[in-house]
Amino acid sequence: MAHLLVVESWVGSMSRLLPRAIRENGHAFTFLTRDLHHYLRSAPEGTAHPLLGARNVITADTNDIEALLPEVERLHGVLGFDGVVTSCDYYLPSVARIAGRLGLPGPGPQAVENACRKDATRRVLDDAAVPGPRFAVREEWADIARAAREIGYPLVVKPVDLCAGMYVRRVDDETQLAAACRALADFPVNARGQRRTPVVLLEELLDGPEVSVETVSHAGAVQVVGVTDKSVGGAPAFVETGHMFPAALPPGETEAAEQTALAALKALGLTDGVVAHTEIKLTSAGPRVVEVNPRPAGNRITELIRHVTGIDLAAACVDVALGRAPDLRRVDTGLRSAAIGFLVPESSGTLEALDGSGVRDLPGVLEAQLAEPGKAVKAAGSNNEYLGHVMAGDTDGPGARERVEGLLDGLRAGLVIR
């Protein structure tokens, strides 16, 4: 049995998937957080709280890495950790530094920092000639406006240090650019109490569909698990509305996406101890890197992969954090594709009706999780405002996405927000 230190977590699906993987592989974990109530307020309904499985729950200021490192050293001397992980993007750089300080397996701290900072990712990939959009990083308004004119409208405005598509916006002119920058400036501290870097990333708007390449790296070798498709809505925001694994692409496009992702991981130095989720745009000029995330995919993509291949990427994340070779053997699950679709609110108010009765019992449905009436609803501007999801599989081919879209159409017909 190994003992892992888990530093913070998301409160969504990965908050359950990672502890499950630790437990099912016979390991134990200590949970380290600055605010236990953040997790208690988000207790999952109908299941035991995942933190009940922790050997220890310890409070420390996880936002002050310089103070945290000696504290974790002291804990390590008493409790003995074999690996350190997190599922929360905001703490990935800290986890890499902790692993380095304790002599535990993991990627280099600078590699993780560069992947988590979108501006640093752009610079590293540009220096390595890995294809991406034209971009600029600016802080003052006059410089932002000038760079936008040089790149050309329409373009994409991004924060360099947020997640889930927060404040990522398409802008078509300088008026929209100013509004997007004001909104970003009005959010100086993230949801975990960390002060943001006040710079703006401007990127050329790329054409074509978006996919993600899911990989696992161990001992210097990076293995591609597969390519996932993505649908996006909520313009001018970029809200993920669904995914299917595997993506229904011609073999040549799949190979091109995979090779581009591998080049990005190599350039960043993420070739050991990382489960990664690399987003790629398949443009008319070829694949372009959107983002590189040095952690397992969110939005239950890991579960799509498990349903189709039997590969558990949460378990792989645990394995590589312990310095162990992950089990990436495929098994015949009977499914040829699996898809998830999200119910995305287009208006704000209170959820009055959402009839999902019987959805879970329909053929091919793998999961259905829906909000209850009475919930306060906010029109979606990121991946944080979903009203639920439906997941379905197809035993014959790439029909899972079509099945999910049909199920969502039925749910929307009974959706009432006032």
Locate the predicted segments by residue.
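ATP-grasp fold ATP-binding core
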Residues: 125-126, 148-171, 189-208, 213, ...
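A conserved helix-loop-beta module that forms one wall/lid of the active-site cleft
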Residues: 101-167, 191
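Conserved ATP-binding module of the ATP-grasp superfamily
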Residues: 131-133, 154-157, 171-207, 240-243, ...
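Conserved protein kinase catalytic/activation segment
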Residues: 286-287
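Peripheral (often C-terminal) accessory segments that flank ATP-dependent C-N-forming ligase machineries
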Residues: 127-128, 318-418
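ATP-dependent carboxylate/phosphate-activation module, predominantly the ATP-grasp catalytic core
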Residues: 203-270, 282, 293-316, 332, ...
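ATP-binding N-terminal substructure of ATP-dependent carboxylate-amine bond-forming enzymes
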Residues: 1-111, 142, 371-385, 393-418
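Short beta-strand-to-turn element immediately C-terminal to the catalytic PLP-Schiff-base lysine
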Residues: 138, 168-173, 216-218
